[in-house]
């Protein structure tokens, strides 16, 4: 039995702080791969792997501002470093206000799925110019392995829409969906992806219109879909709300509260389903942000409790044990 200490700075097997904020866990061939943001000294997407969700081995900076680029479409912008001669406007208060001589862009909330047809690992993320949140784009990258160097294919507005906080979801039949905050965060959009997962093919649903939701997390339990998310309040935590549906493209239940009024001082990052269990166990992972000290933010992982197929909740525990 292994134990997690919530709300602390977790460290990898080399003793270094784990930087994987706004992240995602992919289970692949017996390993849990954890992807997330690293803004400690440079702006990277990091990858870690573990067999037990406790001991995390650092696998590298899998996407950086120096990553290989390969265009997929003339509509995709390959920029990973800002042009020093271009005016990007006023710095947004949520963008880190510190010296950035390398003019890096922001790659936020990276999520990765495996495409069995193309045999590629496909990353989607939220892209911004590093100064403010005016671009509101999605970004795509691919790799032949889960922890190798991803090739960057560019940023874009899916089907012409704004796209900020985001997540990915892969259904049982292999169909993939990209979910993101759109229309200045007022609405939540669900897009069905192309078979290769490299583009948004159709906007299949608009959820919570005018509700200003962000940090979306979508998962499936049995035959029912669930979505978690927070309200837009900057670095300040707020009440997590959830909804559920029998159809990802159909009608969803009204939003309902879960956890407490600050979601235990976290914002949703992802939900991971534990493999090989007689009864499915779903774990909520939240980032406990440190505001301007973004790089020292910590993590909270909690088991989700289900009551029937339309209700869920999770309670806080300082220590959480996992038996894998």
Question: Which sequence ranges carry the predicted segments?
Answer:
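Carbohydrate-active catalytic/glycan-binding domains of CAZyme proteins
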Residues: 1-324
């Amino acid at each position: 039995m292994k134990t997690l200490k919530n709300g602390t700075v977790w460290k990898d097997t080399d003793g270094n702080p784990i930087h994987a904020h706004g992240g995602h866990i992919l289970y692949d061939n017996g390993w849990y791969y954890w992807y997330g943001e690293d803004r400690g000294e440079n702006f990277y997407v990091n990858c870690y792997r573990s067999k037990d969700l406790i001991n995390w081995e650092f696998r590298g900076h899998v996407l950086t501002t120096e990553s290989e680029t390969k265009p997929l479409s003339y509509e995709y912008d390959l920029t990973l470093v800002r042009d020093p001669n271009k005016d990007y406007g006023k710095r947004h208060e949520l963008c880190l206000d510190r010296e950035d001589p390398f003019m890096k862009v922001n790659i936020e909330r990276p999520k990765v799925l495996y495409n069995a047809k193309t045999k590629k690992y496909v990353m989607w993320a939220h892209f911004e110019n590093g100064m403010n949140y005016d671009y509101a784009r999605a970004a795509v990258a691919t790799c032949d392995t889960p922890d190798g160097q991803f090739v960057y294919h560019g940023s874009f507005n899916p089907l012409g829409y704004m796209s900020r906080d985001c997540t990915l979801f892969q259904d049982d039949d292999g169909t993939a969906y990209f979910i993101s905050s759109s229309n200045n965060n007022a609405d939540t959009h669900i897009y069905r992806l192309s078979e290769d997962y490299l583009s948004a093919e159709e906007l299949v649903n608009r959820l919570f219109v005018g509700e200003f939701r962000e940090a979306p997390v979508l998962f499936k339990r049995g035959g029912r879909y669930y979505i978690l998310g927070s309200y837009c309040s900057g670095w300040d935590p707020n009440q997590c709300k959830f909804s559920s549906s029998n159809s990802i493209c159909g009608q969803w239940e009204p939003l309902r509260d879960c956890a407490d009024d600050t979601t235990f001082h976290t914002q949703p990052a992802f939900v991971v389903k534990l493999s090989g269990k007689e009864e499915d166990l779903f774990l909520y992972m939240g980032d406990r942000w440190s505001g301007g000290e973004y790089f020292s933010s910590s993590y909270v992982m909690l088991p989700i409790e289900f009551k029937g197929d339309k209700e869920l909740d999770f309670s806080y525990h300082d220590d959480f044990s996992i038996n894998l």
